[in-house]
């Protein structure tokens, strides 16, 4: 069924919309819109204007929605924003095809933004995003704990990908050539590490996803990596991650172990260091009240 909120520049037949129903379904449960708000905040500096901001926001929103369809399959997730994941309704084959279909529809939109660099930027960041996702999956599926630095490098590739893409597309249409990459990558790092913490401690997250979902997925998140590295002679957390358990009592034991190693406090300290670094960069770049307000709202949400 065609959704009035779903628009692509490529001319789709009315019947084509049944092919992207998994994508339409996931778009019905919109997130907090942080990435779109981030693009708008950078336009405070870049002065591109509302029309181009909206066009680029549609690219980021479309790419993000399609990537979530694939992520949920790769992570064997059950819920997304409190609703059944798309592939549990439409099946894995159609969901994969729908996501890939949307990737190319979004690439077509990039091609029509009006700057030849836009498509190149899109491809470069999609390569980096998939590289990061690949490492994340490799570590999980081989039960191999990365170092903290390896994890942060992966986050720069994966989570930083959509953040950088939005900034780079916006800057392609701006006369402002100031380098904001370090700032946007630090924002991506803050966003991901904070999400890692929320996954383990947030009541809201547990209601919309599940209790300690990263443990059930066998995922190596920032606090989990710290807890593993805190005692190389104790392999219990690695063993639990390898099981990809749904057993709440086992996950509660894992969480208590993570707490006992001071990993949640360590993660909070890392977030505070990142926050101060981000604020300093914003001020050094001339200030940005919209971005500062966005940081404040991010800091105070979902925990």
Curated annotation (Swiss-Prot):
Residues holding dimethylallyl diphosphate: 80, 158-159, 192, 209, 219
Cofactor: Mg(2+)
Subcellular localization, as worded in the UniProt entry: Cytoplasm
Annotated Mg(2+) 1 binding sites: 71, 75
PROSITE patterns cross-referenced by the UniProt entry: POLYPRENYL_SYNTHASE_1, POLYPRENYL_SYNTHASE_2
GO biological process: farnesyl diphosphate biosynthetic process; geranyl diphosphate biosynthetic process; geranylgeranyl diphosphate biosynthetic process; isoprenoid biosynthetic process
Co-factor: note: Binds 2 Mg(2+) ions per subunit.
Gene Ontology molecular function terms on file: (2E,6E)-farnesyl diphosphate synthase activity; dimethylallyltranstransferase activity; geranylgeranyl diphosphate synthase activity; metal ion binding
Keywords: Cytoplasm, Isoprene biosynthesis, Magnesium, Metal-binding, Transferase
Amino acids binding isopentenyl diphosphate: 32, 35, 64, 81
The protein, known as: Geranylgeranyl pyrophosphate synthase
Lineage: Eukaryota, Amoebozoa, Evosea, Eumycetozoa, Dictyostelia
């Amino acid at each position: 069924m065609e959704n009035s909120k779903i628009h692509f520049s490529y001319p789709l037949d009315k019947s084509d919309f049944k092919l992207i129903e998994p994508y339409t379904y996931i778009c019905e449960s919109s997130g907090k819109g942080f990435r779109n708000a981030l693009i708008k905040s950078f336009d405070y500096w870049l002065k591109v204007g509302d029309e181009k901001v909206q066009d680029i926001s549609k690219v980021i929103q479309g790419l993000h929605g399609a990537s979530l369809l694939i992520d949920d399959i790769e992570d064997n997730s059950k819920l997304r924003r409190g609703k059944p994941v798309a592939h549990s309704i439409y099946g894995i084959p159609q969901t994969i095809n729908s996501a890939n279909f949307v990737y190319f529809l979004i690439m077509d939109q990039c091609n029509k933004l009006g700057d030849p660099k836009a498509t190149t930027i899109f491809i470069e960041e999609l390569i980096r995003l998939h590289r990061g996702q690949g490492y994340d999956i490799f570590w999980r599926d081989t039960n191999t704990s990365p170092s903290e630095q390896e994890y942060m490098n992966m986050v720069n590739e994966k989570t930083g990908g959509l953040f950088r893409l939005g900034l780079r597309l916006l800057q392609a249409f701006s006369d402002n050539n100031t380098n904001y990459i370090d700032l946007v990558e630090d924002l991506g790092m803050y966003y991901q590490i904070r999400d890692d913490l929320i996954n383990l401690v947030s009541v809201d997250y547990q209601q919309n996803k599940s209790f300690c979902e990263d443990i059930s997925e066998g995922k190596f998140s920032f606090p989990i990596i710290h807890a593993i590295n805190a005692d190389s002679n104790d392999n219990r957390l690695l063993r639990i991650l390898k099981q990809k358990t749904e057993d709440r009592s086992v996950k509660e034991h894992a969480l208590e172990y993570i707490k006992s190693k001071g990993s949640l406090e360590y993660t909070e300290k890392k977030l505070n260091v990142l926050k101060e670094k981000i604020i300093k960069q914003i001020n050094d770049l001339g200030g940005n009240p919209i971005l500062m307000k966005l940081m404040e709202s991010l800091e105070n949400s979902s925990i």
